[in-house]
Amino acid sequence: MASSHQGNGTVPNSQTDAPPDSSTKRRWRRNRIACDSCHARRVRCDRQFPCSRCLRSEITCEFTRERRKRGRIARSKLAEMAKNKMETSETPAPAKTMNGIPAPAGTEIPGHVSPASTFHHRSPPANAPTVSAPSVDGRRSQTDPQLPVRRPEIGGNVTEEWLAGTHVSPGSYEFLNGPAFGEGLGPFPHMFDVWNGVDLAAYSAGTSQGSKATNAPSTSTAPLKYPVLQPLMPFVEATLPRKLVFDLLDLYFTSAFSTHMHPVSFLSKDAPRPSSPALLSSMLWVAALDDRAFSLPISPPQRKRICQFLCALTIRLLRPLIHVSFKDQGGAAAAVAAAAAAATNNPAFAGVGQDLPPTTVHHPFEGGGDDRGLVGPAGSLDDVITYIHVASIISSSEQKAASMRWWHAAFTLARELKLNQEIEVMPNGDSQVEGSSPPFGYSLPGWDGADPGPVFNYSNPTRSSLNCVCDRQDQNTITEEHREERRRTWWLLYIMDRHLALCYNRPLALLDAESEDLLLPLDEASWQSGIIHSNSPKSDGPQCLLSADKNKRRLFPNFICHDHSVFGFFLPLMTITGELIDLNQARNHPMLGMRLNGKDAWNVHVSEVLRQLEIYKASLTTFAATTSDPEAPLSAYAHAQSEHLPAEPSLSQAYAWHTQTVISYASYLVHVLHILLVGKWDPVSLIEDKDFWTSSPAFASTISHALDAADSVDQILRYDPDISFMPYFFGIQLLQGSFLLLLIVERLQKEAGEGILNACEVMIRATESCVVTLNTEYQRNFRQVMRSAVAQARGRPVNHSEIRHRRKAVLALYRWTRKGTGLAL
């Protein structure tokens, strides 16, 4: 047994502990007597009790671990240990001790922890124990005691201390590719392994034999800078320093993902928004992947491990398509471990779950779902937003086809929760109706779960209780902020559905017909300043008694650009894009396409889309004229973000710059929609030209739009050189706007004019900027194709047949034909 050392300067007797001779340089040996704190963080200890790291962190420096021999533990000894554990659990002592150290009052030493649990435990108990750190030989200690709680020194940099540890040992944190996930299983699963269906329980179930859990609380008693993070801290505090978590949350609200949520509610210290741990984890994950995360004091390898940890944690907390709270998972984890022991006959699983009473084994879907136990609870709005975060991250990677399973989950859950309908607030909250958001029933220390909030009724959308609740202060009623958050989430999904349909050549999932009763999103200035009213111009819609005829909301469909936000200028364009997608799907239909081509009904539809584009172009001109003088809109803009904006001259310049950026992007998108309306979407069919479309008047009309689109891209590069304003949406638009220029250069070769070649050069520069900001394979491939075509047109000697064959092979990867899948390889 190891002796305890409470910072009194005594250390275990060992040959490796002797001081080095001053005349000879001592050979460094494996440090087997690191203090508990350094051992837990996997950092080098100077072996001076108290050590320098503990002194800097103001924590107790002690050595209480059992020192045992290296090598595997005999199976007979494992079975004996499990048997002894079962016997001790049957006769619990009033106060347990561990290695001579009495257990803290009010805490309970867990009898046994399921090896099949993941992320500390499958069901975090009320005291949230954490898994003990691996010992020197790579295994977790058999009886690791409670680890000292780190307290950051006043004025010190906790992030620097944490990063110093990870620099010394890349496996400092077992969740960041550390060795604590078992022998023979390799490192922690990569991000795409999780998305491809890897069960995280396998990584935890394969941990070293005889693994235990300590009784150390994973949360500190210090107040949080952002109390909204309280539900998440038990899961991340043992791995990520608080300062880094706070910085990531701040960074999230400067990203493009935060448009559908209210930053003030999340960052409030008095009344933070009740949020699920999965949503909070996904927000940190989004921020960690943002390019601006490099401004944080973390190295790229550390950033990668942080992203992997937050990825797996988000999936673990989200429980996709199940959405079962953790409070019922203790028995379920024991049942899984018992089944694993029976199936594998592994002594390491012996006795798992024996100390749990039979009543703790609940069905995972108990209290929700159908009577056969096949369908789980619906989920909540937070789950939908979490799906959006996960799906967006995958869409921006090379795994684009895999992202659709997450997008479909978001679409389905949003429709199941009826986010496309104005909700009615029921006066009594005794029972929840079907489709409402369940409360967050996570059992975490110091957090009894978020307030289940109001109860919604979707049965009759014409009731008077649809009216604005801006004058109500009752906590049991839904707030206008939450109603607006639901609307913005639905419209964001609406935008993404059109974007994905254009990217992957698939039909629409969210229809215009099911969106027409929902109010359009509030303008950005009112949303950021918290001036929210549900005041519909329609008599059967929500009415605001306080606003009367003021603050009237916009109705769907709307084809007018009215502000700088993605909902203000991009949503009308995506509404028009949806009609183009319907037209293209009908054109490619095996039967309808032949019947409708050239018919009057088809021409009427094309004329209607042209009318909508003209309405948007006129509104864009008005928007540019009204925002050129920043006096009127500037006051509202400054009121919305007065705490985050610079002085007045800088504010005016930033506002004008933002306006020009929006106008440049919107102008380009209008030209691309013109090309998509009368042109061809598939690059191979465009180049082959089997139907002689290049000889038609439609081709001549699209050339001018292609050149004007290149001019708009030149303006975009002036105001947004790195294409960071809307990188997730712009890539496919840039690709479709470049196909026609590629065709012209391919046909004319050296006869192409300088104007055409300059337009191609602009498109190449924009594509290169996209590659830097959001690196994807299709952009790299198209850049090479476009660059070779321009070089050939400028006189580079090449083998024409060979280079044309290579271009066609690359373009054939991305087809928008009847069977094509677009960018989804």
Curated annotation (Swiss-Prot):
InterPro entries: Transcription_factor_dom_fun, XlnR/Xlr1, Zn2-C6_fun-type_DNA-bd_sf, Zn2Cys6_DnaBD. Its main location: nucleus. One of its GO terms (molecular function) is DNA binding. It comes from the Eukaryota. Residues 1-17 have a biased composition (Polar residues). Residues 1-28, 117-152 are annotated as: Disordered. Transmembrane segments: none annotated. Disruption phenotype: Impairs growth on L-arabinose, but only a small growth reduction on L-arabitol. Residues 35-61 bind DNA. GO terms for cellular component: nucleus. SUPFAM superfamilies: Zn2/Cys6 DNA-binding domain. Keywords: DNA-binding, Metal-binding, Nucleus, Transcription, Transcription regulation, Zinc. One of its GO terms (biological process) is arabinose catabolic process. It is found in: Nucleus. Signal peptide: none annotated. Belongs to the xlnR/xlr1 family. araR subfamily. Transcriptional activator of the arabinanolytic system. Involved in the regulation of extracellular arabinanolytic genes and in the regulation of the intracellular activities of L-arabinose catabolic genes in the pentose catabolic pathway (PCP) in response to the presence of L-arabinose. This is Arabinolytic transcriptional activator araR. It comes from Emericella nidulans (strain FGSC A4 / ATCC 38163 / CBS 112.46 / NRRL 194 / M139).
